[in-house]
A protein has these predicted regions:
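Compact, glycine-rich, soluble single-domain proteins
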Residues: 24-33, 37-46
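Generic structural signal for residues positioned in beta-strands
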Residues: 10, 63, 108-109
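Hydrophobic beta-strand-centered segment that forms part of the acyl-chain substrate-binding groove
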Residues: 42-82, 89
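Hydrophobic residues in beta-strands and at strand termini
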Residues: 13-15, 66, 112-114
Length: 118
C-alpha cells in the first residue's frame, strides 16, 4: 500500500460547461447537482494511488455540506487530507476559483470514511 501523504492533496476538478446534468438542473438557472460534484471528487481522489488504497472499494460519505452553487464553466479545485493510519476520515473541500486561480468560495466540504474504518 502506498504511504499516506502527510499534508493535503490538491487537484484541479474540471467539469465541462456542457456537462449533461446542467440543462435539467435547473432550466434557465443551471447549477451542478451535488451528486455529480461528489462523483467527480471521488474520481479525482481515486486517481491518486495512496488515496485510492486508503479509501478501499466502498468508502462512506459521512458528511457533506453544499455551500455555493457551481455554475457552468466555473473553475474548481479539490483538496483533501487523509488521516494517519488506516482508519479515520478524510476531510475534503471543493473550491470555486477565479480566472486567475484565486479561491473565491467553497462549493462543498465534508468527510469520507475509509472502507472498514470504525
Amino acid at each position: 500500500m502506498p504511504s499516506v501523504p502527510s499534508g493535503p492533496l490538491r487537484v484541479a476538478l474540471p467539469i465541462a460547461a456542457d456537462h449533461p446534468s446542467y440543462p435539467g438542473h435547473f432550466p434557465g438557472q443551471p447549477i451542478l447537482p451535488g451528486v455529480v460534484l461528489l462523483a467527480e471528487l471521488m474520481e479525482a481522489m481515486r486517481r491518486d494511488a495512496a488515496t485510492a488504497a486508503w479509501l478501499g472499494e466502498a468508502p462512506q460519505l459521512t458528511q457533506a455540506k453544499f455551500i455555493t452553487a457551481v455554475r457552468p464553466g466555473q473553475a474548481l479545485e479539490a483538496e483533501w487530507t487523509l488521516p494517519g493510519g488506516s482508519g479515520g476520515r478524510a476531510r475534503f473541500e471543493v473550491r470555486l476559483l477565479a480566472a486567475d486561480g484565486q479561491v473565491i468560495g467553497v462549493a462543498a466540504s465534508g468527510q469520507i470514511q475509509a472502507e472498514g474504518a470504525p
